[in-house]
């Protein structure tokens, strides 16, 4: 049997209210796709039964895997372990893909694969779908990447602060994910940052299509990016940030200037996000955690990496001046209104 072109992994936890919409959009890819539905120990609704229903109805496309609750990261790990597709993409069960864009992307991947030029990383746009005001906002990369051709890290432009690669925008070759040795932490939110970040040094070729493929649903009260939820779960954000500090030696990338620069940019963003949500907490314990995070960065990176982050974008949220915290939170509120990221 021919290898599947792509594996979609859909971690599901009590997702019965919305997962069908997600799955139906993935089924539009037909037999060239493998869909792995990972039931993460759901007990409150019909998620396990829905996974089994689709696996029975589409036995050549859908696999249902039931696991003890391990969190979103273990759902992604489970997908990687079981994937047979050339490419691997995670789709959260409350999100979906645009079907027309998906067909276009897969047609291009088929063409590139037939030519023997399949890239390590395929990149597309993603769209924030805001439920609270029925608006949308597209994140695209036309200023960063060449379009509709193969390229490498030497060809990329400058990322704006609101323009990082996220899980929503990437399709990795499955082998790249295995080669980098990535294993996401269990019972931890925000591990999608590790998923995007850790494999980057293993990516040698890329392809960008200016298509709005991924639809990122935002606005559920219990969503992990909801501000109040993030404040409560800030320890998990800190755990992920420390993991990212440790998982790659950025000094080993000095010969790849643009790749190193982007990874510094991403790590700076993670430090800034951690700082902001600790500031929103506002407690003495949170201030101690903030100081400990910066001390961890200093102890686990070179002086050059630390200085780049501390005195660059990441350090903007850790101002050692009077009323620095108020200035940071004021800037955060302005950015929140402009970009509506949570």
Language-model-detected regions and their locations in the chain:
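Short aromatic/hydrophobic "clamp" motif used to bind/position activated sugar donors
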Residues: 88
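Donor-binding/catalytic cores of nucleotide-activated saccharide
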Residues: 72, 95-206, 214, 218-230
């Amino acid at each position: 049997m021919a290898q599947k072109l792509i594996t979609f992994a859909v971690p599901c936890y009590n997702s019965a209210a919305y997962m069908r919409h997600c799955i139906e959009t993935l089924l539009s890819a037909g037999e060239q796709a493998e869909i792995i539905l990972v039931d993460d120990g759901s007990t409150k609704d019909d998620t396990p039964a829905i996974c089994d229903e689709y696996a029975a109805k589409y036995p050549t496309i859908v696999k249902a895997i039931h696991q003890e609750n391990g969190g979103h990261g273990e759902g992604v790990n489970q997908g990687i372990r079981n994937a047979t597709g050339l490419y691997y993409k995670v789709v959260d069960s409350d999100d979906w893909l645009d079907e027309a864009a998906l067909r276009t992307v897969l047609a291009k991947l088929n063409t590139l694969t037939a030519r023997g030029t399949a890239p390590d990383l395929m990149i597309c746009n993603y769209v924030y779908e805001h439920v609270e005001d029925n608006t949308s906002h597209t994140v695209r990369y036309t200023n960063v990447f060449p379009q509709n051709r193969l390229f490498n890290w030497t060809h990329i432009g400058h990322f704006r602060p609101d323009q990082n690669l996220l899980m929503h925008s990437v399709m990795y070759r499955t082998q790249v994910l295995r080669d980098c040795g990535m294993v996401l932490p269990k019972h931890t939110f925000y591990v999608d940052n590790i998923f995007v970040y850790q494999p980057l040094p293993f990516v040698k070729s890329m392809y960008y299509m200016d298509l709005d493929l991924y639809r990122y649903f935002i606005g559920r009260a219990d969503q992990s990016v909801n501000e109040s939820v993030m404040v409560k779960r800030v320890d998990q954000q800190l755990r992920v940030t420390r993991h990212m500090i440790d998982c790659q030696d950025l000094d080993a990338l000095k010969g790849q200037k643009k790749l190193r620069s982007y990874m510094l940019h991403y790590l700076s963003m993670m430090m800034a996000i951690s700082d902001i949500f600790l500031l929103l907490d506002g407690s003495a314990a949170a201030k101690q955690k903030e100081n400990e995070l910066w001390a961890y960065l200093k102890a686990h990176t070179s002086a050059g990496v630390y200085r780049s982050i501390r005195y660059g974008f990441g350090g903007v949220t850790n101002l050692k001046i009077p009323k620095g915290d108020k200035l940071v939170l004021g800037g955060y509120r302005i950015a929140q209104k402009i970009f509506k990221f949570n």
